[in-house]
Each structure stands twice: as C-alpha cells, then as structure tokens.
C-alpha cells in the first residue's frame, strides 16, 4: 500500500459485474425498486452473495491474511445509504470455512466464519462511533457484545471510506462466546420476530406465560427467571436507555434448546 493508514486496511477485489451490474450487482439499484429511501426492491436488498478476494493489512502496512471469500451487503434500512456495509463470509467452496486470524485481539478466539465491515448504521453521517462506544462501555456487564476495530476499505482499488470492523452476531459468535453450547441446537430470533435459527415456539410460550400470570407472585416470577436471564435483560435495557437507542428492533435474543438454558 502506497498510502499508510493509522488503522487496519481491508481490500475487497471482485469482478465489477458483481458490484455494479443492474442485473446481478449487489451494490447496484437494479430494477424495479421503490424510488424513495431505503429503495426497497433494489439489488442491495436481495439476499445475494458474490465471490471476492480479501486482503487484510495491519496498521503498519503488513499483510495479515488474504483469502477468497463471499461478500454481501449487510444491514437493513442503512442498505439504502451510499456507503453500504459489507458482510465477509468464509466458506468451504471459496477455500476455507474460517478466517484463521485474531481479527479482534480483545477476544480469546482467533477464527471467524464471518465478519462485518459496518458503515455505522444510523450514525453514518455523524460520528460513526456511537454504536461502538456503547458496546465498549457495556462489555464488562456480561452482555454479548461485538468487538470492533476501526478500518478503512478499498473496493477494487478505490478508497471507500472509514468503517468499523465488527464480529458477526451469528451462531458462530455465540459458540465463541459460550463454548459450552451446541450451536446447532439454538433458537435465535431478531427483534422483528425474524427467526435466524430454530423457531420461536419456546419464546412465544414464555411471553404467553408472562401475559397470563401475576409476576408479583414469587413463584410465577421464579419461573420466569428460570426461563430468561433477567439480570442480562436489565443490563440490556440500561444500555438502550443510557445510549438513547430508538432503533429498538435491532436486537437478537437466543437460548439453547435445553431445559436449563435461559433466554439472553
């Protein structure tokens, strides 16, 4: 790299058609799509992945790793922004099932199935630091938080701006943070009730119980505490309130399908 940065540099190289083709490009508008933000129906709203070559350079300019991987546009409404987030996924069909590098030194594990180059979401046009700041402030509470590293992105050799490199919150993330769980035996649900893995039956049963029972009764409350980590939920609410998070649907919650597991 001729230009040295004081942070990590990620380079994504791919066939331009994979990005800009109106028919198949993941960054293109395509057709048809709604002509108002966030442009529902555009190509970047599709669940598409394209092959790419990834290079990851440390702050001193040295190459840490390079590999073939899959790239996709990441996020929800912020997909409509000019600077979009990217998911980078290691898969066997590209050569390796994992990124074998300690991308986030603060975590104890050193391999990842996927990572995210995040455009900072709703803070994209402002500090780009709010989400990272709250995550770092809450990391001693026991909440599962995404580690980060500041990074710059070059897309097919063109400078694409400042990003925050984050862990992907998937079953591999949960397994890395909770080695004791069986990651194939999980229910993972998003705040909009979208099921990422498993189903929502156990969660709905818990909600029905809460709605139909008096939680001022100690026995009823103890039952709820046996099904969800109440302290974990309180810590999450503290983060939401203190951080003035109005995008309250942007959450994932999970449990292992065992009798003793609690929703977190």
Predicted segments, located by residue:
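Regulatory N- and C-terminal appendages and interdomain linkers associated
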Residues: 1-74
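Extracellular structured ligand-interaction cores
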Residues: 7-9, 49-53, 68-70, 83-85, ...
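Short, solvent-exposed loop/turn elements at domain surfaces
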Residues: 18-24, 63-65, 80, 96-99, ...
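Zn2+-dependent metallopeptidase catalytic core
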Residues: 36, 52-60, 129-143
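Compositionally biased P/S/T/G-rich terminal and signal peptide-adjacent segments
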Residues: 79-111
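ATP-dependent phospho-/nucleotidyl transfer catalytic cores
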Residues: 101-109, 117-122, 126, 158, ...
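Short, well-structured beta-strand/strand-turn elements
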Residues: 140-154
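Conserved protein kinase catalytic/activation segment
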Residues: 252-264
């Amino acid at each position: 790299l001729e230009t040295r940065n004081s942070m990590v540099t990620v380079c994504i190289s791919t066939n331009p058609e994979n990005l800009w083709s109106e028919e198949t490009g993941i960054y293109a508008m395509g057709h048809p799509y709604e002509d108002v933000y966030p442009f529902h129906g555009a190509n970047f709203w599709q669940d598409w992945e394209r092959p790419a070559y990834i290079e990851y350079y440390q702050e001193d300019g040295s190459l840490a790793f390079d590999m073939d991987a899959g790239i996709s546009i990441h996020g929800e409404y912020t997909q409509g922004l000019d600077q979009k987030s990217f998911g980078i996924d290691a898969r066997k069909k590209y050569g390796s099932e994992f990124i074998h590098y300690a991308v986030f030194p603060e975590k104890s594990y050193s391999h990842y199935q996927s990572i995210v180059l995040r455009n900072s979401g709703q803070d994209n046009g402002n500090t780009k630091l709010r989400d990272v700041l709250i995550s770092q402030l809450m990391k001693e509470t026991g909440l599962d938080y995404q580690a980060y590293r500041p990074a710059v992105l070059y897309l097919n050799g063109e400078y694409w701006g400042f990003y925050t490199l984050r862990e992907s919150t998937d079953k591999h993330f949960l397994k890395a943070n909770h080695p004791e769980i069986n990651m194939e035996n999980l229910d993972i649900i998003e705040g909009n009730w979208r099921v990422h893995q498993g189903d929502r039956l156990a969660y709905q049963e818990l909600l029905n119980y809460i709605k139909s029972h008096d939680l001022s009764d100690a026995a009823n409350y103890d039952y709820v505490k046996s099904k969800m980590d109440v302290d974990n939920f309180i810590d999450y609410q503290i983060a939401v309130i203190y951080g003035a998070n109005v995008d309250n649907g942007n959450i994932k919650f999970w449990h292992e399908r065992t009798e003793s597991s609690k929703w977190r």
